[in-house]
Amino acid sequence: MLSFPKGFKFGWSQSGFQSEMGTPGSEDPNSDWHVWVHDRENIVSQVVSGDLPENGPGYWGNYKRFHDEAEKIGLNAVRINVEWSRIFPRPLPKPEMQTGTDKENSPVISVDLNESKLREMDNYANHEALSHYRQILEDLRNRGFHIVLNMYHWTLPIWLHDPIRVRRGDFTGPTGWLNSRTVYEFARFSAYVAWKLDDLASEYATMNEPNVVWGAGYAFPRAGFPPNYLSFRLSEIAKWNIIQAHARAYDAIKSVSKKSVGIIYANTSYYPLRPQDNEAVEIAERLNRWSFFDSIIKGEITSEGQNVREDLRNRLDWIGVNYYTRTVVTKAESGYLTLPGYGDRCERNSLSLANLPTSDFGWEFFPEGLYDVLLKYWNRYGLPLYVMENGIADDADYQRPYYLVSHIYQVHRALNEGVDVRGYLHWSLADNYEWSSGFSMRFGLLKVDYLTKRLYWRPSALVYREITRSNGIPEELEHLNRVPPIKPLRH
């Protein structure tokens, strides 16, 4: 029996846009992602799948059914977000901003927020949506769930980001994270949500995987993410505005709440192809991970010609680690290259070049990377950690029981090394809308019938239930702490 500390959280994470729609009255047409996946040009060119989120699992209308199943599995924690476009479907009066902050890369040092301004915002909020979020959170709280309330999971109100115009090279409209106004608006939104729902939240996250937003949106057009405009310069602008937005949202939440505030980041574990590629690992980690966290923990920046910005320093109480697979790198003139055949660059339902099985998404089974990521964060920053997402696209549920046990084992291994890991939240409780890939990728412990909205337990849900009941990995499940046996091909 591999036991976890008393009070350790076992739960699940989910996204509003991916899970909420699917029942009458649940559609939210006012976000950039909603516009993006409905765009005919995107669908015809296969930038997106053509699946539509309004046909989703229906959490908005059936949340109690989801919570019932989570209770049966024995979960005690959840990360859930409030959709910005539901609360403020129309623009707020433009805030008073410092000179120059309508420009794409102007510094945002502070955002003036007080109760009078929050009450003014209250006049513009969609109180029907806010009341429904309160009902959802109250139901979770009444069942004893630890609630990590997240402010942002990739969607922006359409009045802040018109991705179709940006995709076409038209920057005269709302440009999202390319404009400092979004930094101000995000701080205001975060303060407002905390002001209205603080009695129900256990703690807060400002954002989930912001690095995917600036990366997939501007640097990796094959991902199919808005605005799908290839520009490394714009990617850097979006990154710095997001860094500022986190810091200003942290301050905004702290102005109305005493609860802890973290951020959740998309992580891979970098491995060298050969020993001489260790420098490539260091470069990849610095560019893709440490540059972001050094900004919001140490205040260190480089793009504005100064070493430290005090308004960014110490704006973090804990770190949320999302991990799915690794990345293998090698040295290159540009610093490093990622190699196909490993990590998330494999053939679907096949074998990686390391002879490890891959998922429905083509992601390599590699649990040791989670331990490595946790250890590196802990050694560098010493802040409490949560595993906030970890899961696998596996409709048949063949690999998921192995994936679940072997990754939770790596968390236990990190705990034994003295790493302060406070919870493991699986992605996800139920199948949902996988962004540009639509409904084809199924990550759920529960299988969703999208026509009837019924939920069916997969075997992995039973495995997770045994772990939560034991607060650890019981001996009878330890045989799953391994790479899944490779299934023979049928002739």
Swiss-Prot record:
Keyword list, A-Z: Glycosidase, Hydrolase
EC code(s) of this entry: 3.2.1.23
Notes on temperature effects: Thermostable.
One example of a Gene Ontology biological process annotation: carbohydrate metabolic process
InterPro entries found in the cross-reference section: Beta-galactosidase, Glyco_hydro_1, Glyco_hydro_1_AS, Glyco_hydro_1_N_CS, Glycoside_hydrolase_SF
Molecular function as annotated in GO: beta-galactosidase activity; beta-glucosidase activity
One family name in Pfam for this protein: Glyco_hydro_1
Record carries keyword Hydrolase: yes
Catalytic activity: Hydrolysis of terminal non-reducing beta-D-galactose residues in beta-D-galactosides
Active-site residue numbers: 209, 389
Enzyme class: hydrolase
The keyword Lipoprotein appears for this protein: no
Gene3D superfamilies: Glycosidases
Family of the protein in this entry: Belongs to the glycosyl hydrolase 1 family.
The protein's name in its UniProt record: Beta-galactosidase
Organism: Sulfolobus acidocaldarius (strain ATCC 33909 / DSM 639 / JCM 8929 / NBRC 15157 / NCIMB 11770)
